Amino acid sequence: MPIFKKYKDYLDRLEDKTDLNMWGFDNNSIYRIFQFEDFNKALDFINHVGKLSEEIDHHPDILLYDYKFVKISFKSHDKNKVTIDDYMSAHLVDKIFDGESL
């Protein structure tokens, strides 16, 4: 199971999931679609999410389509459902999208 020690302060904020109001729920996963100005910005975002995912050892499904839309989906594959790790990861992805450094 991933350990999010570096991001522990975010866990406390996840008691109230309203921080994730831009995320939907589908097929036992949470997802969000992000829109960018162009392909390069979308790809840069994907690379940032990929780096974070490696760091926390929790990996999303990522879909880039129509050259500027990115769909990020999380579910804990070993449990086949959404867990706190997924909510935590989604919150961190939102921070990346908002331009905050982690």
Place the predicted regions along the sequence by residue.
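Charge-rich alpha-helical segments
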Residues: M1-L102
